[in-house]
Each structure stands twice: as C-alpha cells, then as structure tokens.
A protein has these predicted regions:
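Conserved N-terminal beta1-alpha1 strand-loop-helix module at the mouth
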Residues: 1-117, 122, 137-158, 163-230
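Cationic, low-complexity basic patches in intrinsically disordered or flexible, solvent-exposed regions
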Residues: 128
Length: 230
C-alpha cells in the first residue's frame, strides 16, 4: 500500500479533514519563505487536534539541528523532513535524538536539462538563488540519485521544487532499491500514473490539493481516494 502525506496544513479545518481521510502523515512547514509556513505555537495547536494515529512531519530548510530536535522533544513533530544542505553529520544528530528522518533531493523539473548519458540536453534555466532543496544544479541526475540512495536518512524524497506544483520525469527513478517519497506536481488526476510508474513507498502532496492557496477538502478527499484505490 502506498502511504500518503498531506503537506502544508495550516488551519484547524485542514486538520479536521485530515482526521476524516486518515493519511499516514501530515506535514507542517517551518520555513519562513513558504506561504504555508507555520510557527511552533501554531503547529502545536494543530497537532493537538490531530488524530494521534497520523504522524506529523516537520519540514525544515537548513534549520539548526537543535531547533528540529526541540520540536520533536515537545511533541510537535514525529518526523523531520530536510530540504536544505543538511549533511550526514546533521542527520546523525537527529538520529541520536530519536528522530526519523526524510531527506529530500531535488530533481530537475520536466523540461530542464537532465544530463543523463543518451538523453538529449535541453537548455537549463538560470540557476535560481537560494536553496530550498539539496542543490542539484551542476550535478547530473545520476549523481543526485546515487547520493540519495546512499543517504543515511530513514527515507529519501525525490522532489523537483518547493511547492511549485511541478513534476519531473518519473522514469528516472523507476526501480530505485530503497523506500522513497515521491513529491512534485501530484494531483488526484495524475496520482494513478505516478504510483504505477515508480511504486513509491509514499506520495507527498501540497499544491495539488489546494484552491486559491488553501487546502481544498474536495481535492484532499479525491487525492486520498484515488491513491487508496491503487
């Protein structure tokens, strides 16, 4: 069974819908450059309304390890999801504190230069400023995948962006021999194809279940229903 993570929840009504839909995970984003950013106080309030069977994932970008650990120790999060340049030493600190870790690796979006032998190169857009996910511009997709597979994180995630709703070429990760989360541009309409293509451990959705920047109960329900039917 493919697990489900509904990410970027910010309101009590989002939690209430999640409680009805029963995903395995929900995500709180602790990054002030995200429109879905929440404070520790907000997250604690939301966590208090959440079904205890649903695990909370805290999404961080180059945050001090002590901050991540403190959120875990006070019960705001169960799992840390890392989208910056966090290295193996950083992951070890979280493991030593008892945390389960998901490490995200940035795949080039559909249409960008994927730089694999035998594949035609497409012009790569100008390198963006700021790291939202482990920087991969300048690395081949082969190198990114190799780095991901070797990561000491409990789970890895392949994601082309930072909540932009963009997809990537799923064929590139087909056959990966470890459990991973698939993210990026997933919707109720394409989730069946995504799961059938790469058989991920879990799928992660945020913008694909929103309308006008807020979580849409109908889209949330449709996404979960479509995934559970596979």
């Amino acid at each position: 069974m493919t697990r489900i993570k509904l990410c970027g929840l910010t309101r009590i009504q989002d939690i209430e819908i999640a409680n009805k839909l029963k995903p395995e995970y929900i995500g709180f984003i602790f990054w002030d450059r995200s429109s879905r950013n929440v404070s520790a106080i907000q997250a604690a309030r939301l966590k208090g309304k959440l079904d205890p069977e649903i695990k909370t994932v805290g999404v961080f970008v180059n945050a001090p390890a002590e901050q991540v650990i403190s959120y875990y120790n006070v019960g705001i999060i169960d799992i840390a999801q890392l989208h910056g340049n966090e290295n193996e030493e950083y992951i070890k600190k979280l493991h030593d504190a008892g945390l389960t870790v998901i490490k995200a690796f940035k795949m080039k979006k559909a249409g960008e230069n994927i730089n694999l032998a035998g594949n035609a190169n497409i012009e790569t857009p100008e390198k963006p400023t700021g790291n939202a996910i482990t920087e991969t511009y300048g690395k081949s997709t082969d190198d990114v995948i190799t780095e991901a597979v070797k990561s000491s994180a409990d789970y890895i995630m392949f994601d082309p962006g930072k909540g932009e709703g963009a997809t990537f070429n799923w064929q590139l990760i087909k056959g990966i021999k470890r459990e991973f989360f698939l993210a990026g541009g997933l919707t109720p309409e394409n989730i069946e194809k995504a799961v059938e293509t790469v058989q991920p451990f879990a799928v992660d959705v945020s913008s694909g279940i929103e309308t006008d920047g807020h979580k849409d109960p109908d889209k949330m329900s449709a996404f979960v229903k479509s995934t559970r039917a596979l």
